[in-house]
Regions:
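Bacterial Sec-dependent N-terminal signal peptides
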Residues: 1-23, 39
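Interaction-mediating elements
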Residues: 21-145
Length: 145
């Protein structure tokens, strides 16, 4: 009986994982309102090339690729989690003021190519190949080159 329970559990786990990893192309209008507002506020001059919904086990993520190669990722609530500008720079309005001030003081001639926002930290990628990590109080906690 224990083996049967393990087999059934394994089957459901496998089905759950398989079903959870099916990306679905979507229109911009299907993004959460918060994500739509973010795109209009910071990237209105660029067209959306592709948008997709990435359902995970307990939540959904969203990914948007703009025609200039910029890739933006959103959490299920529409909050941005990552902005990666391949051929340009991240709009400074996205960068928290404390990080912007730090960059102006310590790296005045660089541009931000990408920024990731996780629950406890921000990671900022600069055009001088440095990656700076800040904690949630915006203190620098790591530099990678």
């Amino acid at each position: 009986m224990k083996k049967l329970g393990l087999i059934i559990s394994a089957v459901f786990l496998t089905l759950g994982v398989a079903c959870a990893d099916v990306d679905r192309p979507i229109s911009v209008e299907e993004l959460p309102q918060k994500a739509q507002k973010f795109l209009k506020a910071h990237f209105s001059e660029r067209d959306v090339s592709f948008a997709k919904e990435d359902p995970e086990f307990m939540y959904k993520d969203y990914e948007v690729v703009l025609t200039d190669g910029t890739k933006i990722e959103f959490a299920s609530d529409g909050e941005w989690t990552s902005v990666d500008c391949r051929y340009g720079s991240v709009p400074m309005a996205i960068v928290p003021k404390q990080i912007e001030d730090y960059l102006k003081k310590n790296y005045p001639n660089v541009t931000v190519l990408g920024i990731d926002h996780e629950r406890k930290e921000y990671e900022v990628r600069l055009n001088n190949r440095l990656e700076l990590t800040f904690d949630k109080q915006f203190r620098l906690i790591d530099i990678d080159d």
